[in-house]
């Protein structure tokens, strides 16, 4: 495959059956005339593969030719989660089965109007073969077309679209195919039934005895089953990528995810973004303007060209029509994404949808096909940026000195403990935001990245790090000994992922001895008499009956948050968990009621900042102090800010030696220092040494 680092600026155009054929010729001409260089067409399994031996490509043939005639590059997005009718008739056992026994019947949705959604179980072999045949026919047909540019072989992968939110009774998939393959997976992982019994705490006689883990209460079995599904999705992705590459050796092959923020798409019913990115030639995502989306995309796609191939700035529905967009909106949305490492955009979609619940929204144009507010702003945006897009396209993403851990086992463990993922999602995002909006670059790292070493990282943050394993513990210890700083929250390694048992000491996994730090006693913040929030805040609905009875009998003295006095000159809130710490030769930097609960200790060449609470869970109560604490940790670690700007909300990215992007998320006008004389691209004025950034704005500066 030839190396291609194009800056794409395009639109999604065709999701059969819309737009109508009579609009195609004029629309594709107008797409080019309005500044776009790329167009995406959906090739849908159920629309194209209409019978077992019948394929319909007439619409795609015409669209590809029209794109070429208008000088547009084409990405073909191959869509599989709209399975053809004949599949379900021939293989009724291919349907997804939920934990509660419900069968997921094929259906039409607002975003999958042709039906067949969400497709078949990914462990059903015959439907897998049919998917691969459909992909093979598609790639063979268009690999040599002169308009062909890239293959997007999976659109927003997830295990079962109608059930994408983590709820135990609705988790997929428990069909006979999954049960058979899960048992094979366990045998390959554990080798013997005795090894599995030791880990799970069971007494099975053989792997055929294994009962499917339908809920979260004993952790290890549930984590194994969800990881099995994550690996199933990775295998599916790699099969598609490898097949496409084996047929077409000239065009990049990728897929695009909705980044696993844990709030929408997540590790229980989604995919492992880090694993899916590995075999892609480039990597991409559906993206929004908040930092977590771009950071997750470039972190998973580390070292690859990364794109936003579904820009949702024109979102809406029949109930809520889309917003009118200005060039200021466009710059504020897209420029920070470029700063964080994304190298092109495709808008969803060119014409507003007219079929179903997504109508009449999402359009770059108005309903009649004339240019709309999104299109006007997009044309002005790319018109100004175009002379610099080649330079931007080949610029690497920023090199982060802060890394925030997000491990897939630990994400699942967090669900096991909390019966929800929102608290975990907020934990990770809070640390990412604290770095970004205080003018630091950061990345999200998984277990593998930590174990392989964190080149260039000075501060490693471990949010809600209750579950840990020995490989991670050894890697973190090495990182600190070699000069890094780790900021960890309460009960590090309290649950040993190697044994599926709670540790006898915390931190666990021998870190208490290696680091000379011990949690002397622990309790919930809801038992602390001087907590600053009321006990009524506690949701007890997911507690077991015995705990509920005890709470009713004895009551609760505290609340979610409590105040910690720090040696930094400000107080910070802890939340949910409390541990009184004992640490020889350590500096106490935070106390609650005279008990040390945050300590800093040198270890080797580096530092440990050990928190006997979860700071991230108090963010909604005191964001300012939380972020001030993260900044102090960054200073201890020697992390470099991107510029001298220290005002909260200012973020500066030096994309190349000639191009700087500044984002001001604050409510104030801020004078930002620049390292020379620049031109403000969108304000169209000189910026000699400094520039007054307006509130809630972004600007690109080109060196004069």
Regions found by a protein language model. Give the residues of each.
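A short, well-structured beta->alpha microelement
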Residues: 262-264, 434-453
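Polysaccharide-binding and catalytic clefts of secreted carbohydrate-active enzymes
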Residues: 99-282, 286, 295-296
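An acidic-aromatic substrate-binding cleft motif
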Residues: 1-22, 30-37
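Aromatic-lined substrate-binding rim segments of carbohydrate-active enzymes
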Residues: 25-33, 38-106, 136-139, 240-247
């Amino acid at each position: 495959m030839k190396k291609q680092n194009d800056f794409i600026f395009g639109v999604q155009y065709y999701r059969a059956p819309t737009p109508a054929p009579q609009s195609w010729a004029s629309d594709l001409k107008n797409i080019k005339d309005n500044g776009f260089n790329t167009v995406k067409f959906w090739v849908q399994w159920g629309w194209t593969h209409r019978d077992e031996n019948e394929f319909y490509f007439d619409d795609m043939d015409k669209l590809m030719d029209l794109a070429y005639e208008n000088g547009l590059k084409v990405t073909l997005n191959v869509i599989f989660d709209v399975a053809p009718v004949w599949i379900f008739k021939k293989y009724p056992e291919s349907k997804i089965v939920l934990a509660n026994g419900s069968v997921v019947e094929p259906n039409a949705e607002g975003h999958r109007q042709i039906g067949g959604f969400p497709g078949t179980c990914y462990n059903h072999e015959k439907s897998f073969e049919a998917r691969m045949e459909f992909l093979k026919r598609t790639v063979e047909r268009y690999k040599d077309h002169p308009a062909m540019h890239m293959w997007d072989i999976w659109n927003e992968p997830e295990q079962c679209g109608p059930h994408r939110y983590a709820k135990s009774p609705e988790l997929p998939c428990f069909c006979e195919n999954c049960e058979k393959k899960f048992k094979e997976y366990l045998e390959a992982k554990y080798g013997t039934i005795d090894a599995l019994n030791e880990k799970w705490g069971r007494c099975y006689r053989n792997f055929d005895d294994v009962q499917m883990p339908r809920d979260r209460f004993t952790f290890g079995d549930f984590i194994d089953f969800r990881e099995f599904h994550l690996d199933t999705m990775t295998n599916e992705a790699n099969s598609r990528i490898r097949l496409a590459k084996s047929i077409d050796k000239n065009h990049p092959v990728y897929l695009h995810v909705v980044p696993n923020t844990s709030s929408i798409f997540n590790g229980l019913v989604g995919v492992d973004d880090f694993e899916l990115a590995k075999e892609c030639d480039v990597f991409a995502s559906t993206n929004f303007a908040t930092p977590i989306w771009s950071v997750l995309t470039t972190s998973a796609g580390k070292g690859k060209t990364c794109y936003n191939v579904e820009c949702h700035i024109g979102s809406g529905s029949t109930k809520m029509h889309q917003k009118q967009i200005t060039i200021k909106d466009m710059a504020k949305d897209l420029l920070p994404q470029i700063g964080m490492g994304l190298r092109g955009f495709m808008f969803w979609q060119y014409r507003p949808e007219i079929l179903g619940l997504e109508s009449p929204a999402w359009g770059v144009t108005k309903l009649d096909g004339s240019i709309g507010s999104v299109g006007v702003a997009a044309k002005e945006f790319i018109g100004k940026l175009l002379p610099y897009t080649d330079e931007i396209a080949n610029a690497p993403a920023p090199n982060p000195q802060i890394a925030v851990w997000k491990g897939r086992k630990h994400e699942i463990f967090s669900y096991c403990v909390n019966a929800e993922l929102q608290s975990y999602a907020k934990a990770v995002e809070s640390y990412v935001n604290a770095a970004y909006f205080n003018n630091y670059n950061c990345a999200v790292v998984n277990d593998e990245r930590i174990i392989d070493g964190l080149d260039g990282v000075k501060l490693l943050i471990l949010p809600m790090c209750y579950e840990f394993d020995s490989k991670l513990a050894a890697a973190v210890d090495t990182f600190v000994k070699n000069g890094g700083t780790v900021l960890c929250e309460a009960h590090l390694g309290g649950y040993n992922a190697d044994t599926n048992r709670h540790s006898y000491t915390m931190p666990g996994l021998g870190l208490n001895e290696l680091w000379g730090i011990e949690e002397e006693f622990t309790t919930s913040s809801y038992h602390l008499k001087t907590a600053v929030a009321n006990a009524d805040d506690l949701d007890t609905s997911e507690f077991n009956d015995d705990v509920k009875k005890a709470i009713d009998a004895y009551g609760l003295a505290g609340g979610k948050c409590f105040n910690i006095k720090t040696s930094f000159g400000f107080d910070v809130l802890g939340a949910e968990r409390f541990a009184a710490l004992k640490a020889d030769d350590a500096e106490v930097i935070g106390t609650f009621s005279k008990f040390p609960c945050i300590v800093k200790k040198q270890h080797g060449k580096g530092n440990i900042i050990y928190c006997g609470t979860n700071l991230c869970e108090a963010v909604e109560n005191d964001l300012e102090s939380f972020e001030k604490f993260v900044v102090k940790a960054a200073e201890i670690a020697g992390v470099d800010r991107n510029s001298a700007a220290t005002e909260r909300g200012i973020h500066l990215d030096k994309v190349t030696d000639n191009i700087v992007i500044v984002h001001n998320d604050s409510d104030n006008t801020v004078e930002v220092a620049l390292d020379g004389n620049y031109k403000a691209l969108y304000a169209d004025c000189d910026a000699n040494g400094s520039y007054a950034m307006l509130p809630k704005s972004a600007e690109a500066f080109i060196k004069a």
